[in-house]
Amino acid sequence: AIALGSPYCFQTTLESEYKSDIFGERGILLGAVHGIVEALYQRYRSQGMSQEEAFEQTAESVTGPISRIISHEGILAVYQQMDSDDKAKFEAAYVASYKPAKEVLQEIYDDVACGNEIRSVVNASNRYGEFPMGQIDGTEMWHVGENVRRQRVESEIPLNPTTAGVYCATMMAQIDVLLRA
């Protein structure tokens, strides 16, 4: 692992790796992120934000400053970099999101662990001809994102406290599910 550039190496099993990989993809590594940014995009749009601003406050915020801070300084640093008004918004979003996120993530983990998730994927592929899966990049948000990304100024990407609260709550919920597993 170290020869491949991994900074850490730990003992594991193939079963543990498969469970954590599939669970991770369904959770905060991919599936949950998509759900979070799509839901918050719709919320911000319903509150009057333009399409571009809603994209910046969701997808750009998560993939920009939120992820960068977590990668370099840890999850708590996201909260610590906010002023008191933004901390209150973060806290409200975190508290509202943690328990439902943990419940959904626990169900995902349980389905992966017992094999139901893999069976579901196989069954979905058998139905694909009649019920094709949609493309995630076909939504309004992702079309708007094409233009926003072209005009991106990295230093101007906002750290949205509500988006950060939901994202960090979901990340902590996933960590807690894995610690219990």
Question: What are the residue ranges of the model-derived segments?
Answer:
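NAD(P)-dependent Rossmann-like dehydrogenase/reductase catalytic/cofactor-binding core
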Residues: 2, 38, 46-181
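Catalytic alpha/beta core domains of metabolic enzymes, predominantly
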Residues: 14-28, 32, 153-166, 170
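Conserved anion/nucleotide-ligand pocket segment
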Residues: 1-7, 24-25
